[in-house]
Amino acid sequence: MYDNPQGLIAGSVIMWVVTTLCVGMRFSQKLRDRQRFFASDWLIVAAWIFGTGLTILEIYGVAIKSLGYKIGAAILDPTAITGQLNKAKHIQLAFLLLGIAGIDLVKLSVCFLYWQLFAKAHTKLRRFLIVWITLIALWGTSFVLAGLLECGSHLTAVFGTPTEYLKHCGSAVPSGYAMVATDFAADFVTLIIPIPVVLGLHIDTRKKILTLLIFLIGALSVASSITKGYIYIRSSMGMYTEDALIILTGISMWNLAEVQIGIIAACGPLLRPVLIRAFSPLTTLIASKWRSSSQVARHPKENQELPSHSDMPGSEVDLAKQSTLSEAKAGAQ
């Protein structure tokens, strides 16, 4: 799967094009609606820059035959220590550092989006987000430092013999396990943050389902972090048997995929006009089953109509206002 240079380049370019389109549409939508740019927007641009860097690295690695090709030896085999493998290790270290930073920027962008949408109306959520944003920032910083210092003061041991690597870099694999586990946990928590808020909105059921589905696009990011974790764990267990370059290629490719998929997922809530048209038939079906009781009998015509674009919370401002109104009504009751 990973010894296909043309496929790796094509996949990298396609993901970059899709993320570029998503970020471009996000900004053009804001300019068209004359909305302000917030921290969440600039953070996603920073993540896109890191994603672009990872794409260039992937293509460069394939071009110099350090990624996407077989070397014929396992990563801990003394015969595998060649210039080709060392170049791949340099690329892999850059992938690790840029990948963690890019993923962290995506998470922070999503958290700041929640802040601008919901924090004003929800005091408890505001307090939680302050803590959560701090933890996410510390998560990224700590694992970037862990990547830089995985061999302590013997950084060159990463590119040395297996004996040197095992002697000086013993914490690298446990640190990697901790990173992929906490990455998944952070993605999952970030994904479910808006669910109680959206369920509490005083809007039509179909609108509520549609809004929820748009936020749950973030499940793509959770799925990619699970996949990357699986690839990392499987690769670390196969260091004695699997081809060295294939292991590094697989890890680098899923590092890139997680960042790019995260950017796409983070742009989802701000591309509601496009996604509304895509999800409307599905939400109509779900809502009709959800409310197939007395409400259907009393309002048959209402349930037969698809939600129009003007009826939906189609912008950040509308959704923030809807959240504020719902919280005010709940407080009044």
Regions found by a protein language model. Give the residues of each.
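Extracytosolic/lumenal membrane-interface segments
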Residues: 1-320
